[in-house]
Design a protein with these regions (language model features):
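Asp-based, Mg2+/Mn2+-dependent phosphohydrolase catalytic module
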Residues: 1-5, 125-161, 165-237
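Generic enzyme active-site microenvironment
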Residues: 10-12, 112, 161-162, 207
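Substrate-recognition/cap helix-loop segment adjacent to the acidic, metal-dependent catalytic center
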Residues: 97-110, 114-138
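Active-site neighborhood of HAD-like aspartate-dependent phosphohydrolases
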Residues: 2-45, 68-69
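Conserved Rossmann-like nucleotide-cofactor binding loop
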Residues: 16, 23, 117-118, 167, ...
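A metal-dependent, Asp-based hydrolase signature
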Residues: 23, 34-38, 47-84, 102
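Short, acidic loop-to-helix structural element flanking the phosphoryl-transfer center
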Residues: 60-61, 81-111, 144, 148-149
C-alpha cells in the first residue's frame, strides 16, 4: 500500500515548465521553410482537427494523417526526425528546474500532463524534466478526468496543482475543493485571455512566471495570502 503524503505537487508541462508556444512556432517555421506554406497550413489544420477530436495536440498523428494525403512525398520523413530530435531542453522557462527542486524538498513532485504516447514522453525526457522529478510522470488523455487514478498513485492530504490552463485549475478545484491549492502561472496562450479568465473560478495563487514561485515558502503557498489577486481580477474585466 502506498503511504499517504502530507502534500504532493502536481505540475503541468506545456506552457507551465516548457515554452510550448515557442516550440509550435519552430515547427511552423520548419514546415514553411522545408515544405512550403501550403504544407504548413494543411498540417496545422489537421493538427487542430486532432486537437478537437482528442483533446491534445498529436504532432506525430497529424504528420501520419498528412502523409496519407501525400503518400508519395518521401521528404516528409525528415519531419518526424525534426519532431523527435527537437532540443526541448532549450525551451524550458527560466528557473523551472529550480522550482521543481524546491517542490521536491517539500514533498513528492509529479509531472501531470496530457498528450500522446510517443511525442509527449519524448518531450518530457529530452527536456530534462523527467530526470528532475525522478521519473515521476503521469501522461493522460484528459488529466482532469483521471483524478481518481492520481489519488491512488499519489495519495496525499493536500495537493498543489500548477497549470497554465484556467479550465484545468477550475475543474480540479471543483473536484478536490480545499484539498488542492491551484496555482496559475500567466504564461502561454491563456495568460492574458480575458474571455478565458472570466469563464473560470479564480485560482488560489497567480504568478507572472513559473520562476516567481521561488519567492514563496511552503506556508505562504499553501495557506498564506494570495498575491496578484487584484491583477487577476483586472484581467477578467
Amino acid at each position: 500500500m502506498i503511504a499517504m503524503s502530507q502534500i504532493v505537487f502536481l505540475v503541468d508541462v506545456d506552457n507551465t515548465l516548457l515554452d510550448n508556444d515557442h516550440i509550435q512556432g519552430d515547427i511552423r517555421a520548419y514546415l514553411a521553410k522545408e515544405f512550403g506554406l501550403a504544407c504548413r497550413d494543411r498540417y496545422w489544420a489537421i493538427l487542430e482537427d486532432l486537437f478537437v477530436e482528442l483533446g491534445y495536440r498529436d504532432y506525430l498523428g497529424a504528420l501520419q494523417r498528412y502523409r496519407v494525403e501525400h503518400p508519395q512525398d518521401m521528404d516528409l520523413l525528415s519531419m518526424s526526425s525534426f519532431l523527435v530530435d527537437y532540443p526541448f531542453a532549450n525551451r524550458l522557462y527560466p528557473d523551472s528546474l529550480d522550482v521543481l527542486a524546491r517542490f521536491r524538498g517539500w514533498g513528492p513532485t509529479v509531472l501531470l500532463t496530457d498528450g500522446d504516447v510517443v511525442f509527449q514522453p519524448r518531450k518530457v525526457e529530452r527536456s530534462g524534466l523527467s530526470e528532475a522529478v525522478d521519473s515521476q510522470v503521469l501522461i493522460y488523455i484528459h488529466k482532469e478526468l483521471a483524478l481518481d487514478d492520481v489519488e491512488v498513485r499519489y495519495p496525499a492530504l493536500h495537493y498543489v496543482l500548477v497549470d497554465d490552463k484556467p479550465r484545468i485549475l477550475a475543474a480540479v478545484k471543483n473536484a478536490w475543493g480545499n484539498r488542492v491549492t491551484t496555482v496559475f502561472p500567466r504564461q502561454g496562450q491563456y495568460a492574458h485571455d480575458a474571455k478565458t479568465l472570466a469563464s473560470f473560478a479564480q485560482p488560489d495563487v497567480t504568478v507572472d512566471r513559473i520562476g516567481d514561485l521561488l519567492a514563496y515558502d511552503l506556508g505562504t503557498l499553501v495557506g498564506g495570502p494570495r498575491i496578484s489577486t487584484q491583477r487577476y481580477a483586472e484581467e477578467k474585466r
